[in-house]
Amino acid sequence: GYAGITHEMSEFYEPVPPVVTPGTDSKGGGFTAPSDAIVLFDGKDLSAWESVKGGAAEWDVHDGVFTVNKKKGDIQTKQKFNDFQMHIEWQVPTNITGESQSRGNSGIFLQGMYEVQVLDCYNNPTYVNGQTGSIYKQSIPLANAMRKPGEWNVYDIIYTAPTFKEDGSYRTHPTVTVIQNGVVLQNHTT
């Protein structure tokens, strides 16, 4: 060892992390969530969601997926979250039209304050702080990992909520990590 330091001095036995049974991926014959996950969409209904204007979420549910219904407005989870890890699979339609921000523009809002951009950026240039995987108009993504229209994209988002002092100023800033299709787009971004 180093000058009186033993290996026991650097070994910790508490707190013991909880055991979480990993889920299976969809390529393995059907996706299952990890044992500690809160499932927000079961492939059948939007019972965990609501309209941001109040009332039921009225997007279209079919064939195990849900689809944006522009006429019905935005939706949000009924349950409120602070720190979380989110896994979401999404795609833009094969027949998508438009250019730049008019091509499948959507987003995942974190506590209603920060938006992880969802947009078709496959061969579709736009301003870089508004492309897929950006923290909209705040942080440029490290890469463009967008798949072709009609192919599934995967976001894994890890978010740590801000904390505040009594005067309303930040005690700790929020952080977000965004991984799209296995590629890091945001790495502990504040």
Predicted regions and their residues:
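Carbohydrate-interacting regions of secretory-pathway proteins
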Residues: G1-T190
